Each structure stands twice: as structure tokens, then as C-alpha cells.
């Protein structure tokens, strides 16, 4: 089944909700990044959440998220647009630990419990919207929940889960974001908190094969939920040889000349998809300004 995301409202429009099935998307990220199990879970959660954040945008807007903890993973970076295209990478993809005391992948140990979550939105304006909040747990979902409450003053619940097979491929992945709309009564916030506490962990729902529709129905009940849109999501990279050529130009003529003399060419690799682009001596000469 292809990955997809749904947009919905609940409680007479006082809550907006997003839910996503991202298994194939995360498997493609894992394949391109060659991530081990714990790294796959951390990267997968970040990409899953970022895909839903991208679905909140319009037109040509885009969003980039970065999880920078003090753990061995280093940086986790993901970006998404309003059309369901998402990509991501992690600095150290071969991080893997034994299961934690709850029997789950130890994402917090890999990410670290100190550091920052940063969000950059390109909304087509002169300046980007940027927000940054501290990591509160390293579990990623809780960290983005805190980001929304603190940076955007939007009471939210964020959940993302990734299940990994013994051979490191992705068994299942998905998540949800639910947000209380501005002006909603305090009782709506309290009711949402109770609803979140009442449902099983997102990883359990994913393991049971629950669809995005079923996840939100379990959360709000069928009568209170209105689904407005269903859209596909996929791992798609924006890299190209022309884009990487611009990056090489930015290094300056001296660096380009060194590539020509020492390496008789150059090979550039995209961080996000690991696609390799080769530049001959002649192509490098043409890039000199």
C-alpha cells in the first residue's frame, strides 16, 4: 500500500488533526542512508513528523526540521513541502543500541537528552520563520510536542512510531499530530489530554496495522471526526547536478583548481539521498568564475 496522509478536524472544528502512514517513505530513507535500527527509528520519527508539518503548508512553502542532540547520532535533518514530498538524513546512520528497559529501540540514548529542536519555514516571504526549543526527552515526539506548545503557543500532541525488522528493513511507520485551535475552551484542551492518555502508544497502533483513519477514529470517535483530505506522501529528493555545481562554485576558484590538479575531477554526494554526481576536469574548469 502506498503511503498517505489525512487532514481532519474534530470536536466541531476546535481541533485539527493529521495522521500518516509512512512505512515506504521511511524504508526508502533507510535504504538510501543505510541506517541501523536505532538510527532508523530516530530518522523515521523525524521524517514522519516533518511530513505532517509540511502538510500544514500551502503552495510552494517548505519546512526544514533539525534535531540536534548530544547523543551519538549527531544531527537529524528533514525537510518537506506542501505536496507530500519529504526527505531526511542523519549524521551517523550506523548508531544502534540494545532495547531500552521498556523493550523499545533506545532513541533517546541515540539522540541525547540535551540539545535543540529547530524548525525553519520558508513561506515565500522575505524572511524565514524560525523557531527553536530545547530537547526535553530525546524521544522526538515529545520534543516536537514541546516545540509546538512553546514556540508556536499551540497546544498539541505529536506521536510517531517506527518498527524495524531484524534485517533492519522497516516493518511499519506512521504518526499523528493533533492541535487545539486558537480560541478553544480550556475544557477542549483537557478533553484532548484525556483522549491522548486513553489510546495505546502509537507504536502499538502501527504494529496492529491501524490506518491513519483508524488512528484518528480511535482517538476522537467516528461521530466527532471529519476527514477533509487524503494525500500521498513519498521520499523525494530535490538534488540535481546543477544544484551541486552551484555548491562547488561557492567553494571558489582556488578550491576548484585543487580538485582539478589533485583529483583530476570531483565527486559530490547529496546528504539526503546519497546520490553521487561526478564532475570531469573540463566540467570543473567551466565552473570557475
From Swiss-Prot:
It is found in: Cytoplasm. Its main location: cytoplasm. Belongs to the HSP33 family. Gene3D superfamilies: Hsp33 domain, HSP33 redox switch-like. NCBIfam families: PRK00114.1 (NF001033). PANTHER family: 33 KDA CHAPERONIN. It comes from Oceanobacillus iheyensis (strain DSM 14371 / CIP 107618 / JCM 11309 / KCTC 3954 / HTE831). One of its GO terms (cellular component) is cytoplasm. SUPFAM superfamilies: Hsp33 domain, HSP33 redox switch-like. One of its GO terms (molecular function) is unfolded protein binding. Disulfide bonds join 237-239, 270-273. The keyword Disulfide bond applies. Keywords: Chaperone, Cytoplasm, Disulfide bond, Redox-active center, Zinc. Signal peptide: none annotated. Pfam families: HSP33 (PF01430). GO terms for biological process: protein refolding. Under oxidizing conditions two disulfide bonds are formed involving the reactive cysteines. Under reducing conditions zinc is bound to the reactive cysteines and the protein is inactive. This is 33 kDa chaperonin. CDD domains: Hsp33.
Amino acid at each position: 500500500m502506498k503511503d498517505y496522509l489525512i487532514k481532519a478536524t474534530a470536536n466541531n472544528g476546535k481541533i485539527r488533526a493529521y495522521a500518516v502512514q509512512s512505512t515506504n517513505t521511511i524504508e526508502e530513507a533507510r535504504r538510501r542512508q543505510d541506517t541501523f535500527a536505532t538510527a532508523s527509528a530516530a530518522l523515521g520519527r523525524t521524517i514522519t513528523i516533518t511530513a505532517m508539518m509540511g502538510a500544514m503548508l500551502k503552495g510552494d512553502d517548505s519546512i526544514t526540521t533539525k534535531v540536534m542532540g548530544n547523543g551519538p547520532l549527531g544531527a537529524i535533518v528533514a525537510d518537506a513541502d506542501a505536496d507530500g514530498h519529504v526527505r531526511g538524513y542523519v549524521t551517523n546512520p550506523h548508531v544502534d543500541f540494545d532495547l531500552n528497559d521498556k523493550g523499545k529501540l533506545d532513541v533517546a540514548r541515540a539522540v541525547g537528552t540535551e540539545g535543540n529542536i529547530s524548525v525553519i519555514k520558508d513561506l515565500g516571504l522575505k524572511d524565514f520563520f524560525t523557531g527553536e526549543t530545547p530537547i526535553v526527552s530525546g524521544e522526538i515526539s515529545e520534543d516536537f510536542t514541546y516545540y509546538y506548545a512553546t514556540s508556536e503557543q499551540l497546544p498539541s500532541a505529536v506521536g510517531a512510531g517506527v518498527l524495524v525488522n531484524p534485517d533492519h528493513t522497516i516493518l511499519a511507520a506512521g504518526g499523528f499530530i493533533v492541535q487545539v485551535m486558537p480560541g478553544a475552551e480550556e475544557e477542549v484542551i483537557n478533553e484532548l489530554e484525556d483522549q491522548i492518555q486513553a489510546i495505546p502508544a502509537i507504536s502499538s497502533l502501527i504494529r496492529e496495522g491501524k490506518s491513519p483513519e483508524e488512528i484518528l477514529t480511535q482517538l476522537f470517535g467516528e461521530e466527532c471526526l471529519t476527514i477533509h483530505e487524503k494525500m500521498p506522501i513519498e521520499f523525494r529528493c530535490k538534488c540535481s547536478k546543477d544544484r551541486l555545481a552551484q555548491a562547488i562554485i561557492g567553494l571558489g576558484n582556488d578550491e576548484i583548481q585543487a580538485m582539478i590538479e589533485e583529483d583530476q575531477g570531483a565527486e559530490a554526494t547529496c546528504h539526503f539521498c546519497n546520490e553521487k554526481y561526478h564532475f570531469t576536469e573540463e566540467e570543473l574548469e567551466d565552473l570557475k568564475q
